[in-house]
Amino acid sequence: MTNATPAPEFKSLRIAVLTISDTRGEAEDVSGKRLVTALTEAGHALAEKAIVRDDKYQIREVLSRWINATNVDAVLTTGGTGITGRDGTPEAIRPLLDKEITGFGEMFRVLSYEDIKTSTLQSRATAGVANATFIFVLPGSSGACQMAWDKLISCLLYTSPSPRDRQKSRMPSSA
């Protein structure tokens, strides 16, 4: 007799991708395109895609719209996580989060160390949940985005029900 837990059933999510950059337009957005390819190849749907400047108000405006939309289950952002003067994505996003997933950033840096050694200390990648929507805040490097998707995000999205699903399952049923 086995007490093995059955594998979770895959659920396709609707994911939005936000590129944050002062220098990239649609043609130069390698990281955003890579994330779109990864999520669609994994069986998820692209809900929306946008590019905004490194401006906390522009970032918050788009993100606020997406976390309030019923057609977005998760958001992937790329760019603005470094330590230069214009890198302000974590500061722009943190006030919107209901819960921060601190282990995500920690694990991201551990995995990044294999490729970029101590330069990973300059990354401020993070994740959280806002209005029952997963938010993943990634560097602008396409390699970092691919690694985060392959080793962290795709696994989390596959094995964890979306916060929106968990929220619905806790709601009392109407009689």
Features from the language model and the residues they span:
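Glycine-rich phosphate/diphosphate-binding loop of Rossmann-like nucleotide-binding domains
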Residues: 3-54
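Short coil/turn connectors at secondary-structure junctions
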Residues: 12-13, 70-72, 130-133
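Short beta-strand segments
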Residues: 18-21, 77-78, 137-139
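N-terminal small/polar loop signature for handling phosphorylated ligands or for N-terminal nucleophile
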Residues: 40-42, 47-97
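Glycine-rich phosphate/nucleotide-binding loop
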Residues: 87, 91-153
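Conserved small/polar residues in nucleotide/adenosyl-binding loops
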Residues: 158-163
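Hydrophobic alpha-helical segments, chiefly the membrane-spanning helices
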Residues: 171-175
